[in-house]
Every structure is written in C-alpha cells, then in structure tokens.
Amino acid sequence: MILLIDNYDSFTYNLYQAVGVLTKDITVARNDEITIDEIEKMSPAAIIISPGPGYPKDAGISEEVIKTFSGRIPILGVCLGHQAIAEAFGGKIVHAKQQLHGKQTDINLNTANPLFSGLKSTIKAARYHSLVVDSISLPTCLSVIATDDKAQIMAIRHREHPTYGVQFHPESVLTGEVGNMIIENFLNDIAGIKTTKTKSAALPDSERVELKKYLKIVCDGKSLTEDEAYKAMDIIMSDRASNAQIACLLTALRMKGETIDEITGFAKVMREKMSKVNVKGTLD
C-alpha cells in the first residue's frame, strides 16, 4: 500500500491519478488527520508527500513523517513535500529568484540517479512555487540531483536513505510523460513496488493527430456534439494528444463558451476513467 499525505492541495489528486495508473493500492490521508502510530500500523510500502500552500514547517505531520520513516520506508516529496524533506534534515527554505505558477521550464537532471533513469539530461517540467530549498544550507546528508537554469535546487536525495524530493510537478500535464516515468521509477526502482504499467517512451507529437479534427471544429467557432466531445476527451485522457493541442482546445472552448452537450461528453469520459480514492478522515 502507498500512503499519500495530502497537504490540502488540489494537486494531491493529480498525484493520486498518476500513481493510480501504476498501482491501485493507495490511501490518502490529510496532514492533520493521521498519526505516526497509525502510519506504523498501516505499514505502507512507500510514502508520497504532496504539494501544498505555505511553508513546510506548517504542513501538519509531513516533517514528522519524514524524520520518523526516512530510512525505513521509501519517501517521495513533491514541491512542498520536497521542501519538507530538506527542512526535516536541517535545511532552510528561501524565496525563489522568481515566482513560477503554472510555468514550464527546463530542468537539468542527474540521470545517473535511479529516479531519473531513462530520461534525457534536460526535461521540461511544470513549476508552481515561490519558495526553494536553500543550496547554501543544504545538509550534507542530502545531495542535489536536479537544478534549473538559475542553479536553484529542483530535486534532492538522501545519501543513505531511499528518500527523494522534486520541486517541480511530475504529475502535471505540463510535465507530461516524463513525469509519469519519474513516478514509475520511484515506485519500481526505488520502492521496489511491482507496477501494472511497463515503461514506454512518450508518443512523439508528430503522431498525436487524432484530436486535430475536433480542434478544427472548435477553432472555427462551432460546437462539438456530445459524441464528438466524448471522443475528444477520450483522446486527451488516453495521452494521445500533445500539450499544445490540449491548450489550444481549452482556449478555443473558453472563447466560444462550452455547450451542455460538450460538458456532458467530457464528463462521461471523466467518470469512466476516474479512480476511486481511499481517503482516511474527512473529505471537504
């Protein structure tokens, strides 16, 4: 079982969906609705600590989880979770050189590290943050395994424990298939969890052509039928459309206004492809 600590962030469920493609045994717990003793009894095979608002020291049980289970259970921290790992081991969190919210930038990877196995040395990834791990005060027990073009820390690992953090968002559509590969690497190669999906290279954008006919309809100011909307969303959710095509479709829909038939067609696919979430505690 994989335990996903929710730091009250909508990206938690993007992470859940990304992990759910690989394994169905996931439990989500809010950072103030679970205890260390309860986690001990659950005996998870891996722990993922989600993004969230604010500073990691204010993220409920997150840092205590890292201090208690690092070295015993594989841990992956994303964004705030990544910062929590650094702070838990004595690092400092500082303001980034620029705020990035919903921006895609180049990330330089140490591909010798198992978290980035099979990836190119530079990828494009989604960033949503105004804080970063301070490189000057980084504890010696942690090493940097990714940076951005300003030499800011984008990923870390513990030198002796299977504990990893990424500042960027592997679960975001802006990161795409490489993000899924990072999550798969963590589960397969680091946590030793047998997943249900085998690693595969991303479909080249040149072969992602199915969405184009629906994109043309909307860009011409016309509306999709319910069936057309269903097929378009199925293409998107099956990872057969490029990020540029998806962005163009969403922009065109926004400009002309979505119809009831379009919303109904989209919703049908989402319901069919949704994953059920095991949540410990309350759900707002």
Which residues make up each language-model segment?
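Generic hydrophobic secondary-structure packing signal
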Residues: 8, 58, 80, 225-228
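Amide-donor transfer/coupling interface in amidating biosynthetic enzymes
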Residues: 2-4, 8-11, 17, 21-22, ...
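A short secondary-structure junction motif
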Residues: 49-53, 85, 251-255
